[in-house]
Amino acid sequence: MIVQMYGVSWCPDCRAARKFLDSYGIEYTEIDVEGDPAASAEVVRRVGKRAVPQLVIDGEWFQPYKPGRGLLVDELHERLGIPRA
């Protein structure tokens, strides 16, 4: 499985997504959209706005956080194939 996370260092939602991935030992490549204009443009092209965090799991884009709902833990478990405890 190839996982990429588009985010920024100061974003609390990005920190929550990083913590989730790290807690399950999921390897991922982090792409800083603030320091990489091409990456920022790619996020806008794919999702219509500069919204982070964004995960790309085996080529499929997914926003793991929704305002008012927080980190989408159940969906992350499902998409990453992590069994629920």
Predicted segments, located by residue:
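Nucleotide phosphate-binding site architecture
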Residues: 12, 34, 63
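Structural micro-motif
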Residues: 47-57
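Local sequence-structure signature of Cys/Sec-based thiol-disulfide redox active-site neighborhoods
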Residues: 1-27
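Rhodanese-like catalytic fold shared by cysteine-dependent sulfurtransferases
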Residues: 45-46, 82
